[in-house]
């Protein structure tokens, strides 16, 4: 049975994709909604899929879109590219309905492609209402009814912390430098002369100043695994 994986370019979904490829055919799905960092995400997704340990079991990427720019205002931080600060609580970076949109569009694709299982990289302690088991169960039921075919929506890492996922990714041979956990990624050419020397192979740099960078940095420390990420600044990392 094929499984569709919502792949965002991030660490959690990348490890999930590699994990699912160990079990059978995996179809990566990327859904664009118009967020400021999506160009960098798409580039990272393409790079990851080209070099990831997927055992030859990955279908070509399904790149889908749902334009949410008429819902989230142009001044919204996620649209304007001005993410909340490094120490912002997770609750304050909520994008209302994001998982509703991602799962809905991916589910329609799954129905067309005759895929009966869709997985998302939700982790433990996610505070958002569209990340709960109750939501996923209700969503799967509604989409199965509406599409006229069964669809299982699963979150295999729902009881795992990001550090646990990093350890799993290391065991699978995932190249973490090919993942992106940043709300304000930048190209090397945009960095200041004072920034650290960068590898010429790197195309996308983590800002080091947003809450996603903090979460990533801290999770590598908790996992006891060296963080291969290049951050534009390191002043806030601890």
Regions found by a protein language model. Name each.
Residues 71-72, 77-79, 182, 220, ...:
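Short clusters of hydrophobic/aromatic residues that line enzyme substrate/ligand-binding pockets
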Residues 216-226:
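Hydrophobic/basic alpha-helical segments enriched in Actinobacteria
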Residues 12-14, 125, 212-215, 228:
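Short, electropositive, low-hydrophobicity segments enriched in small/polar residues
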Residues 224-235:
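Short cysteine/histidine-rich metal-coordination sites, predominantly Zn2+-binding motifs
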Residues 1-173, 191, 198, 202-204:
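ATP-dependent adenylation/nucleotidyltransferase module used to activate substrates
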Residues 238:
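Iron-sulfur (Fe-S) cluster-binding modules
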Residues 104, 178-187, 205-218:
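Local cysteine-cluster metal-coordination motifs and their immediate loop/turn environment
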